[in-house]
């Protein structure tokens, strides 16, 4: 089922920055926010508990990638945090992903990172020695994530249709690299607008800088939400 709220990437260096950002929103506006590695490693689980206490939904994007037993143990802890979604890296393999899903169960959605939206085909070939197209690599990772029992993948909106055709219509596609029309793409190389992501079948979109760096984050959020639901 498609999530109507854009997920806001809280890419901040400090707790105080997040608190200041949230002051732009009414207290009764329950957000869906993403906590990434930088923020989680700087603050720790306290930030998750704080945001859950305010009633917000949490996407914990840690991209776990290690041997199956280690990821299983880590996921057993993360599953106690009350999070709504969490990531592992598909490159860790089917066994690793499967072990993570077994221990997490239905406590949260488990999605796999395929290829980062900052990865170009040249990067993939030179650094990863994967001699296929980005789309072929992403679809292969998606199939493996589905095989492992995961709920979906993180992918560019440009790969959504291919992934759903290769897996299932209800296999979730979480798409970062979303930019409103006319905004700068930054370090993202595979981007789409919120409306385009909706039309192509994305289930969740993740938006960072266009909201958190906006002069008025509340207005920016609602404009992106309107585009996403149009």
Curated annotation (Swiss-Prot):
Assigned protein family: Belongs to the OMP decarboxylase family. Type 1 subfamily.
BP terms from Gene Ontology: 'de novo' pyrimidine nucleobase biosynthetic process; 'de novo' UMP biosynthetic process
Known EC number: 4.1.1.23
Signal peptide extent: none
Catalytic reactions of this protein: orotidine 5'-phosphate + H(+) = UMP + CO2
Biochemical pathway: Pyrimidine metabolism; UMP biosynthesis via de novo pathway; UMP from orotate: step 2/2
Free-text function comment from the UniProt entry: Catalyzes the decarboxylation of orotidine 5'-monophosphate (OMP) to uridine 5'-monophosphate (UMP).
Enzyme's top EC category: lyase
Any GO molecular function: orotidine-5'-phosphate decarboxylase activity
Family annotation (HAMAP family): OMPdecase_type1_B
Active-site residue list: 63
Superkingdom of this protein's organism: Bacteria
Residues binding substrate, per UniProt: 11, 34, 61-70, 117, 179, 188, 208-209
Protein name, as recorded: Orotidine 5'-phosphate decarboxylase
SUPFAM superfamilies named in the record: Ribulose-phoshate binding barrel
Subunit structure: Homodimer.
Pfam families for this protein: OMPdecase (PF00215)
UniProt cross-references to PROSITE patterns, sorted A to Z: OMPDECASE (PS00156)
InterPro entries: Aldolase_TIM (IPR013785), OMPdecase (IPR014732), OMPdecase_AS (IPR018089), OMPdecase_bac (IPR047596), OMPdeCOase_dom (IPR001754), RibuloseP-bd_barrel (IPR011060)
Keywords: Decarboxylase, Lyase, Pyrimidine biosynthesis
A cellular component annotation (GO) from this entry: cytosol
């Amino acid at each position: 089922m498609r999530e109507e709220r854009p997920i806001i990437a809280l890419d901040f260096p400090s707790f105080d920055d997040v608190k200041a950002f949230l002051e732009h929103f009414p207290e009764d506006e329950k957000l869906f926010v993403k906590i990434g590695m930088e923020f989680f490693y700087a603050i720790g689980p306290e930030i998750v508990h704080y945001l859950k206490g305010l009633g917000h939904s949490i996407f914990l994007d840690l991209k776990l990638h290690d041997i199956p037993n280690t990821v299983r143990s880590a996921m057993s802890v993360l599953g106690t945090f009350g999070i709504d979604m969490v990531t592992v890296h598909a490159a860790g393999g089917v066994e690793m992903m499967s072990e993570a899903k077994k221990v997490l169960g239905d406590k949260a959605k488990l999605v796999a990172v395929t290829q980062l939206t900052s990865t170009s085909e040249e990067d993939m070939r030179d650094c990863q020695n994967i001699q296929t197209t980005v789309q072929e690599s992403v679809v292969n990772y998606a199939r493996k994530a589905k095989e492992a029992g995961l709920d979906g993948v993180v992918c560019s909106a440009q790969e959504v249709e291919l992934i759903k055709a290769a897996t299932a219509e209800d296999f979730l596609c979480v798409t970062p690299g979303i930019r409103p029309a006319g905004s700068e793409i930054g370090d993202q190389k595979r981007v789409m607008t919120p409306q385009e992501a909706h039309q192509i079948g994305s289930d969740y979109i993740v938006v960072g800088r266009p909201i958190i760096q906006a002069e008025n984050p509340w207005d920016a959020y609602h404009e992106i939400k309107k585009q996403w639901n149009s």
